[in-house]
Amino acid sequence: KTNKIVITNDKGRLSKEEIERMLAEAEKYKAEDEAEAARISAKNALESYAYSLRNTLSDSKVDEKLDAGDKQKLTAEIDKTVQWLDDNQTATKDEYESQQKELEGVANPIMMKFYGAGGEGGMPGGMPGGGMPGGAPGGAAGDDGPTVEEVD
């Protein structure tokens, strides 16, 4: 007695069309994921910049040297930006970048005045403002990385 068994590889496999469709979907989602990552990065940059400015303003050395009107103007702009962030969690990357440029437009001239008035000194090499435009105003000039303060 003989039994004939035929084994085929087609059972339970995806067809060529299904594989192509899945690859196309993966590509589509890849672009969406990259766009979402860029949006989140822009949001984090704005948030970080606003809170960095707020911390810089709360420093007593900065507080002593800043003009009261400038400090009030900058504090109001920071508060406005933080409120905007809270109200616009799903904003686009461009909206976050636009808000950051707006905040920098107010903050940079004020911080330039502060550093120019002999605040904590600029970067070596005569770069007023202690850094590159668009960079966060560091508490300690010449520092390469972010300043981390541990609070109990």
Curated annotation (Swiss-Prot):
Gene3D superfamilies referenced in this protein's UniProt entry, alphabetically? 1.20.1270.10, Substrate Binding Domain Of DNAk, Chain A, domain 1
Q: Which domain of life is it from?
A: Eukaryota
Q: Which UniProt keywords apply?
A: Allergen, ATP-binding, Chaperone, Nucleotide-binding, Stress response
Q: Which InterPro entries match?
A: HSP70_C_sf, HSP70_peptide-bd_sf, Hsp_70_fam
List the Pfam families: HSP70
Q: Extract one GO molecular function annotation from the record.
A: ATP binding
Indicate, by first and last residue, each region the UniProt record lists as having compositional bias (Gly residues).
121-142
Q: Does the keyword ATP-binding apply?
A: yes
What are the record's GO terms for cellular component? endoplasmic reticulum chaperone complex
Which Gene Ontology BP annotations are present?
A: endoplasmic reticulum unfolded protein response
Q: Where is this region: Disordered?
A: 121-152
Q: Which family does it belong to?
A: Belongs to the heat shock protein 70 family.
Q: What is this protein called?
A: Heat shock 70 kDa protein
